[in-house]
């Protein structure tokens, strides 16, 4: 079962990464044109949420992974995130190492304590210099259902449970 589940997770990640690649690349190009005007960047992020229906938050970071915009959400801008230093967050590791588009492993978000994924798109200037990063956060609970990706094995399967619970059930 474990390999089947892992294969399903890998397929889901590849599908999500493929879906995000074009959308985030286009949004990053638009942001590059407005760089570094905060108001114009935040307006573009708010508009970008319409192009990413399952995205929870969009934000921009400078080349040092310091947040240069508020978080854009469907409810508007969340100012408290402006200036946040994100270089040490696990989802930044691939991007800081040079990956043009990275998709994090699942993690529990630091503030909202929700299961999350973060995609990070690198943004380069016209001369190839690193301007910064576009971050897109997703709540795993809000992503489309994945039943088609994972089929439960047809045979009955018993999983080992907590002995204390099992003892209480079968007496």
Sequence positions of predicted segments:
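Intrinsically disordered, low-complexity terminal regulatory regions
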Residues: 1-68, 149-171
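Generic structural signal for well-ordered beta-strand positions
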Residues: 68-69, 131
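Sensory/regulatory domains in signal-transduction proteins
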Residues: 74-75, 79-154
């Amino acid at each position: 079962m474990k390999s089947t589940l892992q294969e399903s997770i890998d397929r889901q990640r590849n599908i999500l990464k493929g879906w995000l690649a074009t959308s985030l690349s286009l949004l990053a190009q638009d942001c590059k044109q407005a760089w570094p005007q905060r108001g114009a960047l935040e307006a573009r992020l708010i508009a970008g949420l319409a192009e990413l229906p399952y995205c929870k938050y969009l934000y921009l970071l400078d080349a040092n992974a310091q947040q240069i915009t508020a978080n854009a959400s469907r409810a508007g801008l969340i100012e408290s995130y402006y200036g946040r230093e994100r270089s040490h967050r696990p989802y930044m590791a691939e991007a800081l190492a040079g990956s043009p588009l990275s998709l994090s492993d699942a993690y529990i978000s630091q503030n909202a304590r929700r299961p999350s994924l973060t995609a990070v798109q690198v943004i380069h200037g016209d001369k190839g210099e690193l301007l910064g990063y576009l971050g897109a956060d997703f709540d795993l609970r809000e992503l489309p259902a994945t039943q088609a990706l994972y089929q439960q094995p047809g045979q009955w399967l018993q999983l080992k449970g907590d002995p204390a619970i099992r003892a209480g059930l079968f007496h």
